[in-house]
Amino acid sequence: MQLGLWFGILAIAATPLVSANYGPAGGHGHGHGHGQYLSGPNAGLEEYVNVASGGNQQAANQIASQAEIQPTPEEARRLGRVQAQLQALNADPNYQKLKNSEDIAESLAETNLASNIRQGKIKVVSPQFVDQHLFRSLLVPSGHNNHQVIATQPLPPIIVHQPGAPPAHVNSGPPTVVRGNPVIYKIKPSVIYQQEVINKVPTPLSLNPVYVKVYKPGKKIEAPLAPVVAPVYSQPREYSQPQGYGSAGAASSAAGAASSADGNAYGNEAPLYNSPAPYGQPNY
């Protein structure tokens, strides 16, 4: 008797829970559930994803937005020092007077920042779009994806080369825009001589690399289009017999030197060329 009473009490207590989950009627609750979650191609999709991931899944607009890398504490301190240096540079009257002059390479703007640039403490990059009216700029990073521009002087003509396409000369005509994203300048002291595309930001910015050759105003500086190291060939001053192998090689070398000293009018000078001795065979 008591067992049946307990079952009755539990059934009465569970009735509101079942009604709240499945609706007051089976058919109405089924239709209401489909109308709430499955009407339309994307209706209720975020709710399903949120439930499946335990509330850890980001919203669709947050997933589609570009990734912003948070700087480490060391980089934050370095960026703070760079910002302080930039503010001091902008407040300097000499920089304000010389930033658009022809003597920018020897001005205070270059000397204050060139040391950090050469030591790799500041990343120098170009804008996202490159055209013929591009100004040579120092972009000081205020964050991984944000930079402040210090425009200095015009950068005349550039040649843009993209793999699979002929080089595009950007020096006249209407403004020509070339995507170069992001572009890293390689720096010699006070001279920007080449820029190349290096994808360092983990976002789908550009799949095809674009290499840009930059000309210094009034002077063409040869630099490879692709970031490769060309081999250095050194021409020897004169050809001489290579080191002999064993006693036969030493004997042939001595015989060649003696014949050269006897037969040539140049006296004791070394012979210009001698045939190498075969392995283990006398000279022929």
From Swiss-Prot:
GO biological process, one term: chorion-containing eggshell formation
Keyword Transcription regulation: no
UniProt main location, coarse: secreted
Residue spans of biased composition, Low complexity class: 244-268
Domain of life: Eukaryota
Signal peptide annotation: 1-20
Subcellular location: Secreted
Presence of keyword Signal: yes
Pfam families, sorted: Chorion_3 (PF05387)
Region Disordered: start-end pairs: 240-284
Keywords tagged on the record: Secreted, Signal
GO molecular function: structural constituent of egg chorion
Family per similarity comment: Belongs to the chorion protein S36 family.
This protein's name: Chorion protein S36
Organism classification: Eukaryota, Metazoa, Ecdysozoa, Arthropoda, Hexapoda
